[in-house]
Curated annotation (Swiss-Prot):
Binding-site residues, ATP: 328-335
NCBIfam families: mutS2
Keyword Nuclease included in the entry's annotation: yes
Keywords assigned: ATP-binding, DNA-binding, Endonuclease, Hydrolase, Nuclease, Nucleotide-binding, RNA-binding, rRNA-binding
Protein name: Endonuclease MutS2
GO terms for biological process, alphabetical: mismatch repair; negative regulation of DNA recombination; rescue of stalled ribosome
EC number(s) given by UniProt: 3.1.-.-, 3.6.4.-
Cross-referenced PANTHER family: OS10G0509000 PROTEIN-RELATED, SMR DOMAIN-CONTAINING PROTEIN
Pfam families found in the cross-reference section: MSSS, MutS_V, Smr
Entry-linked SUPFAM superfamilies: DNA repair protein MutS, domain III (SSF48334), P-loop containing nucleoside triphosphate hydrolases (SSF52540), SMR domain-like (SSF160443)
Signal peptide span: none
Role description: Endonuclease that is involved in the suppression of homologous recombination and thus may have a key role in the control of bacterial genetic diversity. Acts as a ribosome collision sensor, splitting the ribosome into its 2 subunits. Detects stalled/collided 70S ribosomes which it binds and splits by an ATP-hydrolysis driven conformational change. Acts upstream of the ribosome quality control system (RQC), a ribosome-associated complex that mediates the extraction of incompletely synthesized nascent chains from stalled ribosomes and their subsequent degradation. Probably generates substrates for RQC.
């Protein structure tokens, strides 16, 4: 698309309307380079993305994106084998965090059928390992001591020596306070010094770092702390080196994935732009138009997006119409209508929603050309006519049948008779070349051209003769007429003079009377159309009510299906329960190892279909409410599908339960009473429901803090085996930070264990790098 039309129609100002809704720098960059396209598939994809986002926000109104920065320069540095600084790592950390949140959101998204955004979401790549490593850099830009064992050791040494220095200085302050100018420890040149009175400078041996302006105070670093301060300086140099090494290590870890992370950043920005489009639709009442295959345009209640409270108009530019000529006096809104058509096309071809009603349709044009306004060049001393004609000559040389042409005040700026003749000739040339054109003019001769010529239609802007003001309503099919006589009469001009003037233009008066009747018919048609729109709105309300009833019916149907699934599940559960019993007997009577038991269980479970989620079943919920739990009751932990026994009711209302070899603390809603189920179904066997859930629930924990390495590894092996035997989906291992030996041992063990799906550090508020969360397959 030529840039001149974008400037003429102020497309950059249109983009600014979306700017305020954007959260990401990448989204702002994408909007900045956005241009109209002629590829129908690309436009339809852009519109489908907006429709998809609308569905997502209906399902989850709280879905949002966090602000992220552009990582183009960061990616370039990584490609050139450069190392990143802390600020750049924080930018990447934010991008990875948002990427992870989006992946999680998409995986959990239900009840939404996406047509385009699924492709976008599925291209996101999650990097849990890199995210875990970047936890070492906190959001304040500080590299935590657990980033490496060496860094932790260095910082402990610095703290120890600084503590010794403080103790020594405090002792000197206490014992030799009378020799000091002030009872404080000062700092000079990065060293801790004491303000010693000049008269006692030889009584406190050390290094002089500064002298006060008056010469009465000497700032001395006592000899007793010089060596310690030297050690501190050396350790701080080591710290800087280690921090640099950590940054290099993190950069090396990220470098192979730079392209994928950059793609993640683009996706985040793209989703941000899609959300901005949807926000514009909701705030301004915009719509996504249909795309025509025949360049047919139908704009319903279209408005100019840059004009506050713009009058809405209908415009029909069908395939059987080549030109629309808007005639009539100036100041009626003809130019605005011209620009409104151009902007609607440019916005739609850029994948942006347009200010119109549903049912609107746009074409696809390879180029849009316009000659609008007075663009004469003072430097070239061109007249208004010459300026317009220069533009029109250029347009006529470039246009083809795939173009849209907008001409404002065609033929103006010269002799009216010659100007009208030129205007008709130019329009005829465009018509014969089948180039869609909308033109405005105040020459009455063009009314006849519009009436007599095929594929051409007249139009005008409505004028209220009562208020003597333009209404800015577009009247398609009705030529414009002069209201000079009526205006003069209402302003008080003598009736004799007005009548005499009308006698001089009898022919024009007849034409004006015909136009007046056409205007009346158009107004009547508009009223009927308004009534039709009201009926359509009522139908929409009725359709929404029907849809609501349909959804309620589906929910009831799902309830009945769940009951059927429950009965089927009980049969499966019985088989699984019997297999559990067999395996336990084998384990008790033979020398099978725990991991062999786990393998056997896994093979048996493959024989059964996937379990259904009964946690939301109304029948079970009602059964649970029939009796309050008490100590000794058998229970089923819903999140893990494990049987247990209630041991004690705690003060806070939670229950302590024995589940296998593990004790758990449970909320009442986290388990079902098995005895209550027995009372209702005395003839049925009680069974275990084997289920793993991703939702939050009770967890088994192993605390290895304070253990020796060999002892900790043995306990870890036994604990993991027991957790697998008990069908745990997730466990927590607390190893602390310490020297990192136990933590590294845990990581190595988990990496080797084929039953572990994934593991990573806990959130900061749940132990951070001092605890590891393990998720089983």
């Amino acid at each position: 698309m030529n840039t001149k039309i974008l400037e003429t129609l102020e497309f950059n100002k249109i983009k600014d309307l979306f700017q305020g809704s954007l959260q990401t720098e990448q989204g702002k960059l994408e909007l900045q380079v956005l241009q109209p396209t002629t590829k129908k598939e690309a436009i339809e994809r852009a519109f489908l993305e907006v429709t998809d986002m609308e569905q997502i926000l209906v399902e989850d109104p709280h879905f949002h994106l966090a602000a992220t920065k552009d990582i183009t320069a960061i990616s370039k540095r990584l490609e050139l084998d450069g190392d990143l600084n802390i600020e750049e790592l924080l930018v990447l950390k934010k991008v990875l965090r948002v990427s992870h949140d989006l992946v999680t959101f998409y995986n959990d998204l239900e009840n939404v059928r996406l047509q385009e955004l699924n492709r976008i979401f599925e291209n996101l790549v999650d990097f849990p390992a890199i995210q875990g490593s970047l936890l070492a850099v906190n959001d304040g830009g500080f590299i935590e001591s657990f980033a490496s064992e060496e860094l932790g050791r260095i910082r402990r040494k610095i703290q120890e020596n600084e503590s010794k220095v403080r103790d020594l200085l405090q002792e000197i302050l206490k014992n030799k306070g009378d020799m000091l100018a002030d009872q404080v420890v000062a700092s000079r040149n990065g060293r801790n010094v004491l303000p010693v009175k000049n008269t006692y400078r030889n009584r406190i041996p050390g290094v002089v770092h500064d002298i006060s302006a008056s010469g009465t105070t000497i700032y001395i670093e006592p000899r007793a702390v010089v060596n310690l301060n030297e050690e501190i300086s050396n350790y701080k140099a080591d710290e800087r080196y280690e921090l640099l090494r950590i940054l290099q290590e993190l950069s090396a870890m990220i470098r192979p994935h730079a392209a994928e992370i950059a793609n993640n950043a683009w996706i985040i920005g793209h989703l941000d732009l899609v959300m901005a489009k949807l926000a514009f639709m909701r705030e301004r009442g915009a719509v996504v138009p249909a795309i025509s295959d025949t360049q047919a345009i139908q704009l319903l209640q279209v408005r100019h997006p840059l004009i506050q409270n713009a009058v809405a108009n209908d415009l029909h530019f069908g395939p059987d119409l080549t030109e629309i000529v808007i005639t009539g006096p100036n100041t009626g809104g003809k130019t605005i209508m011209l620009k409104t058509l151009g902007l609607a096309q440019i916005m739609a071809q850029s994948g942006l929603p347009i200010l119109a009603d549903k049912g609107s349709r746009v074409g696809i044009f390879s180029q849009i050309f316009a000659d609008i306004g007075d663009e004469q060049s003072i430097e070239q001393s061109l007249s208004t006519f010459s300026s317009h004609m220069t533009n029109i000559v250029s347009i006529l040389e470039q246009v083809d049948s795939e173009s849209l042409v907008l001409l404002d005040e065609l033929g103006a700026g010269t002799d009216p008779q010659e100007g009208a003749a030129l205007a008709i000739a130019i329009l005829e040339d465009l018509r014969l070349r089948q180039i869609k054109t909308m033109a405005t003019t105040h020459y009455p001769e063009l009314k006849a051209y519009g009436i007599e010529t095929d594929w051409v239609e007249n139009a005008s802007m409505e004028f209220d003769t009562d208020s003597l003001r333009p209404t800015y309503r577009f009247m398609q099919g009705v030529p414009g007429r002069s209201n000079a006589f009526e205006i003069a009469r209402r302003l008080g001009l003598s009736e004799v003079i007005v009548s005499h003037a009308q006698e001089q233009t009898n022919t024009d008066s007849d034409v004006n009377q015909i136009i007046e009747r056409l205007e009346e018919q158009t107004l009547e048609s508009r009223k009927r159309l308004d009534n039709i729109r009201e009926v359509e709105q009522e139908n929409l309300k009725f359709n929404r009510a029907l849809k609501k009833l349909y959804n309620e019916f589906n929910r009831e149907k799902e309830t009945e299906l769940n009951k059927a699934r429950l009965e089927a599940q009980e049969i499966v559960d019985l088989a699984l329960s019997e297999s559990e019993s067999i395996l336990k007997n084998l384990h008790a009577k033979s020398s099978l190892k725990p991991h062999e038991i786990i393998e056997a269980k896994a093979q048996l479970k493959k024989l059964a279909p996937e379990t259904v989620d009964l946690s939301k079943n109304k029948v079970l919920k009602q059964a649970k409410k029939n009796r309050a739990p008490k100590v000794g009751d058998d229970i089923l932990v819903t999140s893990y599908g494990q049987r247990g026994t209630l041991v004690k009711l705690l003060k806070d209302g939670r229950w302590e339960a024995q589940v296998g070899l593990i004790k758990m603390t449970l909320e009442e809603q986290e388990f079902n009473l098995l005895k209550a189920e027995k009372e209702q179904q005395p003839k049925r066997k009680q069974v275990n429901v084997v289920k793993r859930a991703n939702t939050a629930g009770p967890r088994a924990r192993l605390d290895l803090r304070g253990k020796r390495y060999e002892e900790a590894m043995k306990e870890l092996d036994e604990f993991i085996d027991q957790a697998l035997l008990n069908n745990m989906a997730q466990v927590d291992i607390i190893h602390g930070i310490g020297t990192g030996v136990i933590r590294e041992g845990v990581n190595k063990y988990l990496r080797r264990n084929k039953h572990v799906k994934s593991f990573g550090y806990a959130p900061q508020n749940a132990g951070g790098s001092g605890a590891t969360i393990v998720i089983f397959k």
